């Protein structure tokens, strides 16, 4: 699975003009299931995201996790994280997981974060969503579950 993680002061996702997920301080996580992801990819990625130390401590160093600060997580599915732009001008998405399994892994990721005690809001898989955020820092981190055993 791939994730683009943004430290936010606030974030919100809307579908057809209605807010379906909103958080205050915490993380906005755009997530994509990749073809061939193992069954435990969602849980492993969730554990890494929950412990990622990108919030400031008393010494103004990035040394605290979203769990440490009592923050929340907004999880939004985004298959375009699988974009292959190596050739041509139009990205390919063949490395993204098929929608049915992709949605299952996306939901497992959100549930795994909840199981770790985090408040989690979500977008709507496959919907045309509008995401607004205030990126705090800005801090934006790319994470791929395949990068770590």
From Swiss-Prot:
It catalyses: glycyl-tRNA(Ala) + H2O = tRNA(Ala) + glycine + H(+); a D-aminoacyl-tRNA + H2O = a tRNA + a D-alpha-amino acid + H(+). An aminoacyl-tRNA editing enzyme that deacylates mischarged D-aminoacyl-tRNAs. Also deacylates mischarged glycyl-tRNA(Ala), protecting cells against glycine mischarging by AlaRS. Acts via tRNA-based rather than protein-based catalysis; rejects L-amino acids rather than detecting D-amino acids in the active site. By recycling D-aminoacyl-tRNA to D-amino acids and free tRNA molecules, this enzyme counteracts the toxicity associated with the formation of D-aminoacyl-tRNA entities in vivo and helps enforce protein L-homochirality. Keywords: Cytoplasm, Hydrolase, RNA-binding, tRNA-binding. Homodimer. GO terms for molecular function: D-tyrosyl-tRNA(Tyr) deacylase activity; Gly-tRNA(Ala) deacylase activity; Ser(Gly)-tRNA(Ala) hydrolase activity; tRNA binding. GO terms for biological process: D-amino acid catabolic process. This is D-aminoacyl-tRNA deacylase. Transmembrane segments: none annotated. Gene3D superfamilies: D-tyrosyl-tRNA(Tyr) deacylase (3.50.80.10). A Gly-cisPro motif from one monomer fits into the active site of the other monomer to allow specific chiral rejection of L-amino acids. A motif (Gly-cisPro motif, important for rejection of L-amino acids) lies at residues 137-138. Its EC number is 3.1.1.96. It comes from Paracoccus denitrificans (strain Pd 1222). Belongs to the DTD family. One of its GO terms (cellular component) is cytoplasm. It is found in: Cytoplasm. InterPro entries: Daa-tRNA_deacyls_DTD (IPR003732), DTD-like_sf (IPR023509). Pfam families: Tyr_Deacylase.
């Amino acid at each position: 699975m791939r994730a683009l993680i943004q430290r936010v002061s606030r974030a919100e996702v809307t579908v057809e003009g209605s807010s379906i997920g909103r958080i205050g301080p915490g993380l906005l996580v755009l997530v994509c299931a990749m073809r061939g992801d193992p069954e435990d990819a969602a849980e492993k990625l969730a554990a890494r995201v929950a412990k990622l130390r990108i919030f400031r401590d008393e010494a103004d160093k990035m040394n605290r996790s979203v769990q440490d600060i009592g923050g929340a997580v907004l999880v939004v599915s985004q298959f375009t994280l699988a974009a292959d732009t190596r050739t041509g001008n139009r990205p390919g998405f063949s490395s993204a997981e098929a929608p049915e399994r992709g949605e299952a892994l996306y939901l497992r990721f959100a549930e795994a974060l909840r199981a770790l005690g985090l408040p989690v809001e979500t977008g709507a898989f496959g919907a045309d969503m509008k995401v607004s955020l205030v990126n705090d820092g800005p801090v934006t981190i790319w994470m791929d579950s395949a990068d770590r055993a």
